[in-house]
């Protein structure tokens, strides 16, 4: 069983996201420890990028703050090395294809393998172009995690059949951010996914409250939350890890029902 599969093995998974380096890497490390200690099953780590096209204003702001603080891909790798001394849950990078290309794809993925990164999400990588990275990901044992947005049944089935790690189901078209209600027929998407793969699926984009998380976990195998955590960092700065830990605990309790 892959490390990512273990995140879903004990029941519904809660998956928080954080942008590395916002407001600084020391705070990111403390937040990762707080999330892991309070029940996060898997953590998505954003490597900051100057043009994060999938993100709404909250996570765009986090990217900008992290870059202004001097965060680089190498510094993020060092951060993961440090937290991996005692954080055993799966860690997945979420970044953009350009970050991987500019670093050198093989160098990037070999470093991921060395420091204990379990998966990679590239929101700007179309399914049709995933073979640019898939062979290297397989070579280094890093799951290339696909995203499924509301689309045709045939396309959902096609993406699901080749899924690795887990499937990231996008709750609605558009950018990340918190939403008051989610209108997409997610149950229909999950049904098609489950007919085509045993790989678990989690829903993200727009989830912020325990009620929303519980509802999404009722439909899929887990819930993903990013913007709500970034807002805590925006509000509390270096004091945010304690608040983030308490928030993750509430969300995990909701997901497990």
Report residues per predicted region.
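Active-site-adjacent beta->alpha loops and helix N-cap segments on the catalytic face
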Residues: 1-7, 50-59, 71-81, 101-107, ...
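N-terminal amphipathic alpha-helix/helix-capping segment at the start of soluble metabolic enzymes
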Residues: 1-18, 80-85, 256
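Hydrophobic faces of well-ordered beta-strands that scaffold small-molecule active sites
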Residues: 14-18, 43-45, 91-95, 120-122, ...
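Glycine-rich beta-to-alpha transition loops that act as phosphate-gripper elements at the mouths
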Residues: 19-24, 94-102, 126-127, 147-151, ...
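Catalytic cores of alpha/beta
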Residues: 25-35, 151-161, 203, 207-223
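Glycine-rich phosphate-binding active-site loops on the catalytic face of alpha/beta enzymes
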Residues: 40-51, 117-121, 126, 171-177, ...
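Active-site beta->alpha loop and helix N-cap motifs at the rims of alpha/beta catalytic domains
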Residues: 47, 60-122, 255
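Alpha/beta catalytic cores of nucleotide-metabolism and tRNA/nucleoside-modifying enzymes
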Residues: 76, 191-199, 208-257
């Amino acid at each position: 069983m892959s490390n990512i599969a273990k995140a879903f093995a004990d029941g519904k998974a809660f998956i928080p996201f954080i942008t590395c380096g916002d407001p600084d890497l020391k705070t990111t490390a403390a937040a990762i420890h707080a999330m892991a200690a309070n029940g996060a099953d898997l953590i998505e780590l954003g490597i900051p990028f100057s043009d994060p096209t999938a993100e709404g204003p909250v996570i765009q702001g986090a990217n900008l703050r992290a870059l202004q603080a001097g965060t680089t891909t190498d510094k993020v790798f060092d951060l993961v090395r440090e937290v991996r001394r005692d954080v055993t849950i799966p860690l997945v990078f979420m970044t953009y294809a350009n970050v991987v290309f500019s670093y050198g794809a093989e160098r990037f993925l070999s470093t991921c393998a060395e420091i204990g990164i379990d998966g990679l999400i590239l929101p700007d990588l179309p399914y049709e172009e995933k073979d640019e990275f898939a062979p290297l990901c397989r070579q280094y044992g890093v799951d290339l995690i696909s995203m499924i947005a509301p689309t045709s049944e045939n396309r959902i089935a096609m993406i699901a059949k080749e899924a690795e790690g887990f499937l990231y189901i996008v709750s609605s078209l558009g950018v990340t951010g918190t939403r008051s209600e989610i209108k997409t027929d997610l149950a229909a998407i999950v049904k098609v996914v489950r007919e085509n793969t045993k790989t678990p699926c989690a829903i993200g984009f727009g989830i912020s409250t325990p009620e929303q998380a519980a509802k999404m976990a009722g439909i899929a195998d887990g819930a993903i939350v990013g913007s709500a955590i970034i807002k805590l960092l925006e509000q509390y700065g270096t004091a945010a890890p304690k608040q983030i830990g308490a928030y993750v605990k509430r969300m995990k309790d909701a997901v497990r029902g």
